[in-house]
Amino acid sequence: MKGIIYLEDGTVFYGTGFGKEGNEFGEIVFNTSMTGYQEILTDPSYAGQIINMTYPLIGNYGVNESVNQSKCVYAKGFIVKNIDENPSNYTSEINIDQMLKNMGVVGVFGVDTRSITKKIRSYGTMKCIISNGELSIEELKKMMDASNIVDDYVNTVSTKEIIHIAGNGNKVAVMDFGIKNDIIENLKERQCDITIFPYDTDYNEILNINPDGIFLSNGPGDPKSIPEAIENVKKLIGKRPMFGICLGHQIIALASGGNTYKLKYGHRGGNHGIYDVQRDKAYITAQNHGYAVDEESVLENGMIITHRNLNDGTVEGMKHKSIPLFSVQFHPEGAPGPTDTTYLFDQFVNL
């Protein structure tokens, strides 16, 4: 089955198709992780995107449903150099090709993924069509011209109903913008009594459960695309201790009077270095975001920068000077990636 990667600038890469047969449009991004392809695919933050893996060998240890970060794959496509259809791992249940077929995801392998990555780094994230169907280049061009990138997927990935997970510890209200399972597991490990709310839940309904703390989850797209959530968070700030991760971090910035902006090609992978200003220590972290917090705008609104990216100096963490409010851009839960910064969950429950 022929596979095609058609980029916004007209560049075409030919490979072999796998997974679901079809044609999908999305924003192409690259991920630098060497492992964790299953967690990456099932991370709701990739909604609407086509993931290009820089590491050349994908699928070596198979697929085990227990490590999925959500119930399905929201990404539009998956690009790899080589796939292993005969994995060797005692926990493996199916191979990567079967996973993509089961989840309805178009895949292409056998292309130069490093070349694609260099192009994204030079050009920035761009529109892309991934195809293993029967469309010609001319038909793919027409599809490209008629399509636009959408940065509002939170409504798609957020829970549609309130979910309660009983625990014996602190009562935590979670605003779900596309939460990963391992974040929930970290809260459960700390005995939290968890109530997960849809992203657009009114602030009064959240306060009605009398939570000890409020957690803002990760999620896909542009934080400015969900103004209703920003307005609710504005009204919640200062009412209870609050902690945000990834998209939740950006929403806290906006709700506090700060600003966010789109990065040229984002940070995605399990090997991103950050500096913890308060601990005077560097950590390797998992990251997955295309937007960042504008530093000056949050400093003007009572924030202190707590973490910085060691590659480009962007804001990776902040806290308020006088109220129990903090957030980080990276993923302390890893999944996939290091878990050296899970102390942040302890910091939250101890506020």
Swiss-Prot record:
Positions annotated to bind L-glutamine: S45, G219, G221, L247, Q250, N288, G290, Y291
Gene behind the chain: carA
Pathway membership, UniProt: Amino-acid biosynthesis; L-arginine biosynthesis; carbamoyl phosphate from bicarbonate: step 1/1; Pyrimidine metabolism; UMP biosynthesis via de novo pathway; (S)-dihydroorotate from bicarbonate: step 1/3
Stated name of the protein: Carbamoyl phosphate synthase small chain
Organism: Clostridium acetobutylicum (strain ATCC 824 / DSM 792 / JCM 1419 / IAM 19013 / LMG 5710 / NBRC 13948 / NRRL B-527 / VKM B-1787 / 2291 / W)
UniProt entry keywords in alphabetical sequence: Amino-acid biosynthesis, Arginine biosynthesis, ATP-binding, Glutamine amidotransferase, Ligase, Nucleotide-binding, Pyrimidine biosynthesis
Region named CPSase: 1-171
Domain Glutamine amidotransferase type-1 intervals: 171-351
Its biological purpose: Small subunit of the glutamine-dependent carbamoyl phosphate synthetase (CPSase). CPSase catalyzes the formation of carbamoyl phosphate from the ammonia moiety of glutamine, carbonate, and phosphate donated by ATP, constituting the first step of 2 biosynthetic pathways, one leading to arginine and/or urea and the other to pyrimidine nucleotides. The small subunit (glutamine amidotransferase) binds and cleaves glutamine to supply the large subunit with the substrate ammonia.
Family: Belongs to the CarA family.
MF-aspect GO terms: ATP binding; carbamoyl-phosphate synthase (glutamine-hydrolyzing) activity; glutaminase activity
Keyword Plastid found: no
